[in-house]
Amino acid sequence: LTEINYPFNVKIKLVKPYDGAWMILHNENGHAALGAVEYMGNSILKTQDAYYKETGKRLEGMAQCLGNYITYYYPYGRGEMFNLFSVITDKPEESGVMCQWKKFELMSPLTKMVYSSDQSRFNYSNVKLIDGEASWGAVCLSDGVLFQSPAAMKLYKANIAADLGDNIRIKYASKAGFGAILYDEVGHRFCFYQNQSRSTTGDPNRFNPTNENPSSYRINPVPKRDNNVTDVDVNNLPVEQKVLWVGAGYEFDPNNSRGFYANSVSIKGLDSCFVYEFNMDGMVSTVDGHPAFAGYYKLKLPEGMDENSCFASTMSYSGILFYTVGNVVYRLDFKQSGGKATPVYTHAGGKATMMKFAKKAKINTNYLDFTNYEFDPNRSLGIVFDMGNGKCDFVV
C-alpha cells in the first residue's frame, strides 16, 4: 500500500538435484520407474518417476537393481572419488551409470561396463546386485556369477581359487571393508573376495585385465586362523541349515577400512536360527591377529522369522540385526544370551519385501556430503511394504 520496499535478510542454500535422496527403482504400468524421496529442510519432496521428470522419457525395461559405488571416474573429474549411481533394468542398453545432477544422463551403458571377454558369462536379464559399500571396489551378481569392479564401474568376472572347484554359484554377496562376503549355494559354504587396491584407472573405457583382474585376486575359501571359531565349518556348512542372507555389519575400527564385520543368518527347520560373524580384517590379513570367522550364535528361531523375512545391518550397531515378519520390523540382539527379538515398527498392513540402510560408509567427506539429508545415513533404515494391487509404501 505504501509502495516502500523493505529489505529482508534471507539465507539460500543451493543443492544438487537428488543429493542425499532415497532412490527407489520400482515397476509401474509394465515398465521400470525411478522414484525419489528428497529432504528439503523440514519438507519431504516425493517424485513418482524422477527419470521421466528429468528426461521426458520412460524406462522401457523391468526393474532389476540399483547400485552405488565410491570410486574414481574420469568423466566426472580427475583426482577425486565420486559416488557412482547405477540403474539396472532388463534392457541393458538403457541401464548403467547415470548422473543424477545431469538429468540422469547415461554415462556408461551396462553393455560397455562388462569386459568384452567376460560378456558371455554376464546375464543382462538377471542382475541381482551391485554393491560398493565401504571402500575398495564393488561386486556385482549376475545369474550366480560374481563380477568385480576395481574402479569406474568396469566389471570383470571374478577369478576362482582352484580349491573351490569350478561348480560354484553365488546366491548372496555383500561388500564389507576391503572384501566381500559370499555364500555359494552349490558348495553350501561361505567364501570371500578380496577387493584390495590394485593398479587401475578411472577411465571407464580402458580395460586392463592383467592389472585390474589379476589371477592373485580371486574368490577364496574362508581362511583358517588359529583363533577362528571352531563350532562349525564355514567352508562346509551343516546340510540342515538354510542360509537366508549375508550383509556388512558393525565397523569395529573406524580408522581402518578393513575394520568391518560381516554377518549371515541361517535357519534350521522351525526351531533354530544361527548368526555367523566374520571379521573382514582377519579375512584379508594376519597382521593384527584378528580371526576370520569371529562368532557363531545359536538361537531359538526368533518370532516369525522365515525364508520370506528381509534382513539388514549397519556399521553403527554391534551385535544387532533387523528383520521383518509380514508388516512388522524387529531388532534382533543376537549377542544377548539366547538372543532377543524386539518389534520396533508395525506398518498399517502390507508385507515388507525389501529393507536396507541408507549407507555403510564414512560420511562428512568431500565426496560423501549428506548434509542435505540431515540424518545419520548409517541409522536410517528404508523399508518397502507391498500393499497389494500393484501399490507399495516406502518407510524410513
Predicted regions and their residues:
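Low-complexity, Pro/Ser/Thr- and charge-rich linker/hinge segments at domain boundaries
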Residues: 13-30, 112-116
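Preference for solvent-exposed, low-hydrophobicity sequence contexts
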Residues: 79-309, 338-342
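Conserved, compact domain cores that house catalytic/ligand-binding motifs in diverse enzymes
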Residues: 22-93, 385-387, 391
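Blade-level signature of beta-propeller repeat domains, shared across WD40, Kelch, NHL, RCC1
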Residues: 353-396
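Short loop/turn segments immediately following the C-termini of beta-strands
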Residues: 27, 39, 88-92, 141-143, ...
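Beta-strand-enriched, solvent-exposed domains that form extended recognition/catalytic surfaces
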Residues: 1-18
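Hydrophobic core register within WD40 beta-propeller blades
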Residues: 34, 66, 309-314, 355, ...
